[in-house]
Amino acid sequence: MASSDAAAAQAATPLLKDELDIVIPTIRNLDFLEMWRPFFQPYHLIIVQDGDPKKTIRVPEGFDYELYNRDDINRILGPRASCISFKDSACRCFGYMVSKKKYIYTIDDDCFVAKDPSGKDINALEQHIKNLLNPSTPFFFNTLYDPYRDGADFVRGYPFSLREGAPTAVSHGLWLNIPDYDAPTQLVKPLERNSRYVDAVMTIPKGTLFPMCGMNLAFDRDLIGPAMYFGLMGDGQPIGRYDDMWAGWCTKVITDHLGLGVKTGLPYIWHSKASNPFVNLKKEYNGIFWQEELIPFFQSASLPKEADTVQKCYLELAKQVRAKLGKVDGYFNKLADSMVTWIEAWDQLNPPKGAVATANGTAKSK
């Protein structure tokens, strides 16, 4: 009996509870955490408050968290705080920067616990962790999808030399209920709902881009963290709602170059409410046209062999953004500058081993 109790206790131990931070951008009280309490309470939360820093954000009791507002961001980063968006959920990437954990899970505050087809609550975090801890298959598509899941395997004809897979850098989760639409689609399909639950996880093939959504996303911070910059969006910028997609395009180019994998599929969350399509259209208007230039840019982007770290890859991408997308609109020159500033800020707060960080400055070796 004692051994079965011990086994039950071991099974209930949260996976990676000391190695994972949950990052939540918000402008409101976080009552939604009550629904997530059984799954999130053992973890450390990093809350990034957008908007008015004088506003008080209420967090339910019993959660271990840090909360950063705009004043904190300015204090910690100094002049480099200019790279962190204001009045846009892109501010969440500040949480990635200040975290000291190996893994990050980020979720929006309008996302609730979904149920699987049997009616059981879905532990989204547990599935993301499984996705990240198992390899990806970016170099050859497996028709049974993720061969490392229980009940699946490599199919006949899958090269034996590729069956070890590649390290998984990103786990991109999905959603039920309110779709993740652009504003024009939102306007013509106001009653559409995502109701189809697909029990699958797959690796996005090398050379294929995808529209990354930040509302239910996990990643290995050690492998890809510096590439998870959600751009310069929102207040004072000519574009919004492209923050997660920008990060996804940059990340995919870099993971392809470094031989890392990106998974999409399970887990699902319940997206509870639609944002205003007219407000969204104003934010997205330029992006709707610009993306016709952005997609070919990322599809043809190539990184040199010398770019052997995420930071080097990202700085090279920033150069290419300036050289090629700067012709599309002057905003992209500003964005390229912010990409460089982001890497400087990342290295400021995350100095290489053997170096110490100086306040609002570069790292100096001991």
Swiss-Prot record:
Its main location: Golgi. InterPro entries: Nucleotide-diphossugar_trans, RGP, RGP_fam. Keywords: Cell wall biogenesis/degradation, Glycoprotein, Golgi apparatus, Isomerase. Changing residue 163 to A: Decreases activity 50-fold. Optimum pH is 6.5. It is found in: Golgi apparatus. One of its GO terms (molecular function) is intramolecular transferase activity. It catalyses: UDP-beta-L-arabinofuranose = UDP-beta-L-arabinopyranose. Glycans are attached at residue 156. Its cofactor is Mn(2+); Mg(2+). Disulfide bonds: none annotated. A motif (DXD motif) lies at residues 108-110. GO terms for cellular component: cytosol; Golgi apparatus. The record marks 156, 163 as: Required for activity. GO terms for biological process: cell wall organization; plant-type cell wall organization or biogenesis; UDP-L-arabinose metabolic process. Reversibly glycosylated in vitro by UDP-glucose, UDP-xylose and UDP-galactose. SUPFAM superfamilies: Nucleotide-diphospho-sugar transferases. UDP-L-arabinose mutase involved in the biosynthesis of cell wall non-cellulosic polysaccharides. Catalyzes the interconvertion of UDP-L-arabinopyranose (UDP-Arap) and UDP-L-arabinofuranose (UDP-Araf). Preferentially catalyzes the formation of UDP-Arap from UDP-Araf. At thermodynamic equilibrium in vitro the ratio of the pyranose form over the furanose form is 90:10. Is probably active as heteromer in vivo. PANTHER family: UDP-ARABINOPYRANOSE MUTASE 3, UDP-ARABINOSE MUTASE. The conserved DXD motif is involved in enzyme activity. Heteromers with UAM1 and UAM2. Belongs to the RGP family. This is UDP-arabinopyranose mutase 3. It comes from Oryza sativa subsp. japonica (Rice). The gene is UAM3.
